[in-house]
């Protein structure tokens, strides 16, 4: 029975999501809230923690693999390896800390550098801790403007109240799915083109 369950899960489409952002912005809290419906305020930072969950995305069962990376500068050198494996990115900052918002530009540059061969990288900018409106340092218009400049979606979340937590993960998975479908279509088109070309050449030889 267990073997069948593993087989079924392994046949599901897997979307790989990377959590990116400065330390203390709530990346782990967002991840744990999405995974387990729990709010964890104090979390010890590590190099990276990986989570996997089966979800229903627009009527289809899929798996999401979430890699929660550390924001500390000490781990900057190993981030490249994590970024290479990612298919979509949640770029998180805290609305109560403007420095963490400023840092998103550097994180984005690192992602673009590592994924330079890819055309459009699925990425969402996430302003976390929206429940702390009285401590806001990053105006919503400023954050939204930066996201528009980058051509990506901006969403404000609260890991504490669970506001928009599911939304950011599901919206990102949709972008990842769209990119995969587009890439598969391109690959199939190229294969079809090669087949037609080969057939035409063989016809000429006959």
Swiss-Prot record:
A motif (Effector region) lies at residues 43-51. Its EC number is 3.6.5.2. A lipid is attached at residue 203 (S-geranylgeranyl cysteine). SUPFAM superfamilies: P-loop containing nucleoside triphosphate hydrolases. CDD domains: RalA_RalB (cd04139). One of its GO terms (biological process) is regulation of developmental pigmentation. Keywords: Cell membrane, GTP-binding, Hydrolase, Lipoprotein, Membrane, Methylation, Nucleotide-binding, Prenylation. InterPro entries: P-loop_NTPase (IPR027417), Small_GTP-bd (IPR005225), Small_GTPase (IPR001806), Small_GTPase_Ras-type (IPR020849). GTP binds at residues 21-28, 68-72, 128-131. Pfam families: Ras. GO terms for cellular component: midbody; plasma membrane. It is a lipid-anchor. Its main location: membrane. It is found in: Cell membrane; Midbody. Residues 180-206 are annotated as: Disordered. Belongs to the small GTPase superfamily. Ras family. Multifunctional GTPase involved in a variety of cellular processes including gene expression, cell migration, cell proliferation, oncogenic transformation and membrane trafficking. Accomplishes its multiple functions by interacting with distinct downstream effectors. Acts as a GTP sensor for GTP-dependent exocytosis of dense core vesicles. Required both to stabilize the assembly of the exocyst complex and to localize functional exocyst complexes to the leading edge of migrating cells. Required for suppression of apoptosis. PANTHER family: RAS, DI-RAS, AND RHEB FAMILY MEMBERS OF SMALL GTPASE SUPERFAMILY. Interacts with ralbp1 and rap1gds1. This is Ras-related protein ralB-B. It comes from Xenopus laevis.
